Amino acid sequence: MIIERLVGNLRDLNPLDFSVDYVDLEWFETRKKIARFKTRQGKDIAIRLKDAPKLGLSQGDILFKEEKEIIAVNILDSEVIHIQAKSVAEVAKICYEIGNRHAALYYGESQFEFKTPFEKPTLALLEKLGVQNRVLSSKLDSKERLTVSMPHSEPNFKVSLASDFKVVMK
């Protein structure tokens, strides 16, 4: 089965009205436009998203829906550094330092809370800066991601030469 577009999200439906099968993804797999996965029930699916969301797949995104059957995305919990800022200045410092490392940064549950995937050097940096943090297991959902840049991404358009294009050698 080849999935080329998203159908919606489970939060917009009553999942009890459907038979839902899930594709379990790690947080870093949510930004893939082309991939192969197996659902929990063993169905092979290939994803080739034409208009992939800029932030990536989110928890509950529906990949397939037919009558009462749905295949949806489940983002697995992973080891995460939960960061709690004390002030706007500390928020700026956190965003600068995490961004400088090109690490993913996500909104947390409260106003000054953020999450980033666990890495020992990042944890050591936060400790050195005196930023309150703790390591927990939680989901890193793409819809909560602060950064949208995607290194080495392919353009979402085709380039073609004009019919009157000429190369002149002198």
From Swiss-Prot:
GO biological process, one term: protein folding
GO cellular component: cytoplasm
SMART domains per UniProt: UreE_N (SM00988)
InterPro entries: UreE (IPR012406), UreE_C_dom (IPR007864), UreE_N (IPR004029), UreE_N_sf (IPR036118)
Entry-linked SUPFAM superfamilies: Urease metallochaperone UreE, C-terminal domain (SSF69737), Urease metallochaperone UreE, N-terminal domain (SSF69287)
UniProt keyword Cell inner membrane present: no
Annotated compartments: Cytoplasm
Sample GO molecular function, one term: unfolded protein binding
Keywords: Chaperone, Cytoplasm, Nickel
CDD domains listed in its UniProt record: UreE (cd00571)
The keyword Ubl conjugation belongs to this UniProt entry's keyword annotation: no
Protein family (similarity comment): Belongs to the UreE family.
Family annotation (HAMAP family): UreE
Job description of the protein: Involved in urease metallocenter assembly. Binds nickel. Probably functions as a nickel donor during metallocenter assembly.
Name the record gives this protein: Urease accessory protein UreE
